[in-house]
């Protein structure tokens, strides 16, 4: 019974580290998404000023952003051995307390 409890605790720790790693990855992807949206917005602004080939260029940008192949080339960092900072550990403790 004691060994089973230890196994469950190890599994819980692993899952918490995985959760933290996925949370970090999600935050990185959100930042990347905002950067891409900003690039698109700035290019649209530049295109409005030049006013030639506007529809074709903006369409190409949207196709590139929505291109499934380019999205699938993004590598996800899912290693459970990633370093968990003290802040993340504190956040995990706070979340588990609620």
From Swiss-Prot:
Part of the SNAPc complex required for the transcription of both RNA polymerase II and III small-nuclear RNA genes. Binds to the proximal sequence element (PSE), a non-TATA-box basal promoter element common to these 2 types of genes. Recruits TBP and BRF2 to the U6 snRNA TATA box. The keyword Ubl conjugation does not apply. It comes from Homo sapiens (Human). Changing residue 18 to A: Minimal effect on SNAPC4 binding in the absence of SNAPC1. Reduced SNAPC4 binding in the presence of SNAPC1. GO terms for cellular component: nuclear body; nucleolus; nucleoplasm; nucleus. Pfam families: SNAPC5. Keywords: Nucleus, Phosphoprotein, Transcription, Transcription regulation. It is found in: Nucleus. Disulfide bonds: none annotated. Changing residue 8 to A: Reduced SNAPC4 binding in both the presence or absence of SNAPC1. Residues 86-98 have a biased composition (Acidic residues). This is snRNA-activating protein complex subunit 5. Residues 73-82 have a biased composition (Polar residues).
């Amino acid at each position: 019974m004691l060994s089973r409890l230890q196994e469950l605790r190890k599994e819980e720790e692993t899952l918490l580290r995985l959760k933290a790693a996925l949370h970090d990855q999600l935050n990185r992807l959100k930042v990347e998404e905002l950067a891409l949206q900003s690039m698109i917005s700035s290019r649209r602004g530049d295109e409005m000023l030049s006013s030639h080939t506007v529809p074709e260029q903006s369409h190409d940008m949207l196709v590139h952003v929505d291109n499934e192949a380019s999205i699938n080339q993004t590598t996800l960092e899912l290693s459970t051995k990633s370093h968990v900072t003290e802040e993340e550990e504190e956040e995990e403790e706070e979340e588990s307390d609620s």
